[in-house]
Amino acid sequence: MKPSPVKSTIDFEQDGLQHGFLKLPHSHDESAYGSVMIPISMVKNGEGPTALLTGGNHGDEYEGPIALFDLARTIDPRQIRGRVILVPAMNYPAFQAGKRTSPIDSGNMNRSFPGNPEGSITEKITDYFQRTLLPLAEWVLDLHSGGKTLDFLPFCAAHRLEDKQQEQRCAEAMRAFNAPYSMMLLEIDSVGMYDTAAEAMGKVFITTELGGKGTATAETVRIAKRGIRNFLIHAGILEGSPELSPSIHLDMPDQRCYIGSESNGLLEMKVNLGEKVLEG
């Protein structure tokens, strides 16, 4: 396979705090020699584990980018042991456009793994994550929310996996994140997902859904920031004690947990998110 066309402007082995870009050449009508410039930050202090923290996998989900851009600005290298790689907006073209998918190639990044160094813009970005960034990390956190089309109770999720020891490590990280809701989830459409790529490499991987409706609230951003800190403490990278509060544990073990309409029409909500309902 050919080398990735994506080039990083930061040195992944250098101690200290660095801010830079993942630079991907992209010739288009407005710039013959243009590039997609994806912000990336890294903080490193000696030897230790590596965490890869990502947001903006879908461009209309804002809690991750807000929390990670803030962390990149405020993190102190003296407070960590190891390395933290931050990519606040993985699909940066989609993030700039406020769209779920890329305006360049309509690529859904979370259905484009493992990517292709000779493919579309989205496939070239996912290939760089697959072959360069994911192999650097033992711990992976991908922050999502509902975007413009969904609304969620704020939860952190770990997946049901064939490797039960890996599943247990992921579940422990999910509980450490300490969102208001903690979910064990069996993905029913996992082909091409970032999640699947990370888990296939044996990583400790967790993800979130922190609201939606195409916006971010002060509360969901607070949940993201607190959860990131707790995750890094749990990974043994960040100093300090976790900030914990009660979390409701949920389980989505199979396809019965998904109910879709088979017809068009007007939807009237009878209950709000989080309300208890009876079967039948």
Language model features by range: what are they?
Residues 1-279:
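Structured catalytic-domain cores with a bias toward divalent-metal coordination
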